[in-house]
Amino acid sequence: VGGGTHIYDPQSTLIDAQRPYLMTIGENVQITHGVTILTHGYDWSVLKGVYGDVIGSAGEVVIGNNVFIGTGSIILYDTKIGSNVIVAAGSINNVIIGANSLVNKSFPDNVVIAGNPAKVICTLEEYYKKRLSIYEQEAICLVKCYRKKYNKEPGYNELHEFFWLFTDSNDELIPLYKHMNELVTIDKTNEKFKQNKKKYKDINDFLKSVPWGE
């Protein structure tokens, strides 16, 4: 966090502390009442409830210098805000509702809705396929940011939302990974995990695949 940055109402402000190495806040950033800044999301719980997969999420949040963030704004992961920016205030079954959405009518099942006013932006199946397609890249981003911050490799805990990349039903799961598989739904996940074909032999194989210094 750069100099001259102020959080005016810390009690109402939520800044994601789970992965601090994914967040950079510049100088003279003014963070007002009710602001939320996230470096991960738990919307994958809906996908897990329907499909069974653990498809974690992670992404950088970079806020430049001389930025004003208005009341009630929500900044999601994988977001970069440049310098000299003003962020305006206030920025169903198996439904994912995007941050800061205004829902003022009924919506069908199995959709993702967002906006003010809210509208359907895609089906749950489309969102599921999208998450699968970028899941590994988000894990790689996490590794690179962790290395940059701490100059060492992330471990089992840091990669707990991405362990399906390097773990399958033939491996003995650590308690944290067992817990992840038991969230939301167990039976669907157990069946899906039996079918999971890990891309990497183990966590070290995955980490070796990510070049240092990029």
Predicted regions and their residues:
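Flexible, glycine/small-residue-enriched loop-and-beta-strand segment within the central core
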Residues: 3-81, 89-94, 117, 123-125
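Conserved metal-binding segment of the jelly-roll/cupin
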Residues: 72, 90, 98-100, 106-107
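Short beta-to-alpha loop/turn elements within the nucleotide-binding domains of ABC transporters
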Residues: 79, 100-101, 107, 116
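Conserved acidic donor-binding loop of glycosyltransferase catalytic domains
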Residues: 104-105, 123
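Catalytic binding pocket for nucleotide-activated donors in carbohydrate/polymer assembly enzymes
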Residues: 109-114, 125-126
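Terminal amphipathic alpha-helical/low-complexity segments used for targeting or macromolecular assembly
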Residues: 118-214
